[in-house]
Amino acid sequence: MTDSNLDKTLVLIPARMASTRLPGKPLADICGLPMIVQVAKRAREAAIGRIVVAVDHDDTYAAVANAGFDVVMTGMDHQSGSDRIHEALRAVDPDGRAEIIVNVQGDLPTIDPETIRASLRPLENPAVDIATLTVEIKDEEEKTLPSVVKVVGSAISESRLRALYFTRATAPYGKGPLYHHIGLYTYRRAALERFVSLGPSPLEKRESLEQLRALEAGMRIDVEIVDTIPLGVDTAADLEKARRILSGASR
């Protein structure tokens, strides 16, 4: 990636302290570092642009700043991570230099930097508004779990889909692969601005999936198929698993 592209790409990592299942989640210790710092390190290893962490608590702000990463304070009342990163974007880039905004969830401490880089590829097509990621489901149980969001899409190539729908149901019906959505989004700046200006859509509210707001508004989402799915830390058990993974990686 050229220096020019690095200047035009901004990685924003939202961190919310008020997790119901794992209170104080961004500061949970993983191998001697707060989880949010581990995520920021993975983003730095991806080397795609400036990294800013968007926080809502003084303790998180201090932890991120002490680790040497850029950080911005945001409000506590955001309904989604997209709303939080939009506030952060306006604060850290008011002049509009950044053209591509990468939203890396703050609870993915084991994410492969190459997975982050992969999210940029669909935006090489100027017709695409938003890019995201998916992995083929191999576990039969996952195919019916509502917690595993499925991508329904038309194949553009062996490694990419054009999203038609996202659902917690088992879809599409019939023989063929099913795809597990990875909640990392890369936006064109104008697409993010438009997205947050729209109110929650009917299907978004029904499925509790904010990306449906974009599809209902006629925005194009392309989905890059990757090989591995990062561990999302939502529970104490997830946290222990993340510690084991990163402990093994550091040896």
Swiss-Prot record:
Enzyme kind, highest EC tier: transferase
Function in brief: Activates KDO (a required 8-carbon sugar) for incorporation into bacterial lipopolysaccharide in Gram-negative bacteria.
GO biological process: CMP-keto-3-deoxy-D-manno-octulosonic acid biosynthetic process; lipopolysaccharide biosynthetic process
UniProt protein name: 3-deoxy-manno-octulosonate cytidylyltransferase
MF (Gene Ontology): 3-deoxy-manno-octulosonate cytidylyltransferase activity
Compartments, record wording: Cytoplasm
InterPro entries the UniProt entry points to: Cytidylyl_trans, KdsB, Nucleotide-diphossugar_trans
Family: Belongs to the KdsB family.
E.C. numbers: 2.7.7.38
PANTHER family attached to this UniProt entry: 3-DEOXY-MANNO-OCTULOSONATE CYTIDYLYLTRANSFERASE, 3-DEOXY-MANNO-OCTULOSONATE CYTIDYLYLTRANSFERASE, MITOCHONDRIAL
Record's keyword terms, sorted: Cytoplasm, Lipopolysaccharide biosynthesis, Nucleotidyltransferase, Transferase
CDD domains (alphabetical): CMP-KDO-Synthetase (cd02517)
Domain of life: Bacteria
Keyword Transferase carried by entry: yes
Keyword Nucleus included in the entry's annotation: no
GO CC entries: cytosol
UniProt pathway annotation: Nucleotide-sugar biosynthesis; CMP-3-deoxy-D-manno-octulosonate biosynthesis; CMP-3-deoxy-D-manno-octulosonate from 3-deoxy-D-manno-octulosonate and CTP: step 1/1; Bacterial outer membrane biogenesis; lipopolysaccharide biosynthesis
Catalytic activity reported: 3-deoxy-alpha-D-manno-oct-2-ulosonate + CTP = CMP-3-deoxy-beta-D-manno-octulosonate + diphosphate
